[in-house]
Amino acid sequence: MSRRTSSRGSSRREAMVGNVPIRSLPKVSLHDHLDGGLRASTVFELAQELDVPLPADNPRALGEWFAESASKGTLEEYLDTFHLTLAVMQTADNLTRIAREFVEDLANDGVIYGEVRWAPELHTDGGLTMAEAVQAVQDGIEEGEDAADEAGHAIRVSQILTAMRQANRSLEVAKLAVDFREDGVVGFDLAGPEQGFPVSRHAEALSYLAGEFFPVSLHAGEAEGPESIRDALITGRALRIGHGVRIAEDLETIETEDDEVRVRFGDLARWVRDREIPLELSPSSNLQTGATAAWGASLEDHPFDLLYQLGFCVTVNTDNRLMSRTTLTRELSQLVETFEYDLDDLEQFQLNAAAATFLPVELREELIDLITEGFNR
């Protein structure tokens, strides 16, 4: 795709593409964790109420602590920061509040549809059952949708229930997801440490979901390479790949005699590209966790643009807004600055995401129409 001149957005001023504020554009968020999307001020307030020790003495400093602690270069160290957010997410009231604020923050960022993923099994220390936790989150989502609507911003948010790869409750979580399929839950996920905990450990749960025709998006290709993605597709029947950035390891760059550069596809990469299997790329998070270390340490080294130019179905996501101190607007702005994308490129990313949602086809088509209309304006 040809590149056109784009104004370079600034994190200190309104991020722009051309003369259009990126925040004003309709967006779709596919990969956004509830326990990574809290406001630092909310964590600070709730932790004080619960006497949870804090590493900072004010909300701003706490936000800086999350970002710095999550930027150590490995997924394991990135995940260590979640002990603090999880500590304040063990009651129905807190879960409802956090989910409501989560939706409000998405709406303020121009998101018109989002899928929030989280692991109910990590929210039972205060005595909640997993089903009670799911209902508390759903209550908060609906409150957030109503508040956004009153403020003039229509938004819909669905839940994706996550099971932890290192635990043994995936079948229980899978059945819970199916039980709530008419009450806000649209998908299932596996998250947590990727190395040493393959998708195949959860074959029973994933077979159950396949039998129920229930959509699956699995974390893969983040801390491990192409074999993890292969496992997600074959064992997990995944319809989307959470991150999936390391699919680029199945591509080989070849210089020809006339100094042209060509790319040779491995079988897996060609399958993912040709079948248009969506990749839930999260640029800032990928840099923090070291998922892109094989290519470099800056955004310009991220294989996002390579995958996009080669025709992969790329989508742009935040992963964990608190840990990455980011928003979808900021992620898109950084891509515009780095790769000189224009309005057409940003629209394509949103259309990819809209088509990849776990909504019924009629609602996906409505979402695509809303995006097209919004970008045309």
Protein language model regions, located:
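Short HxH-centered metal-ligating active-site micro-motif
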Residues: 219
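Metal-cofactor-binding active-site regions of metalloenzymes
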Residues: 2-4, 12-214, 222-240, 246-377
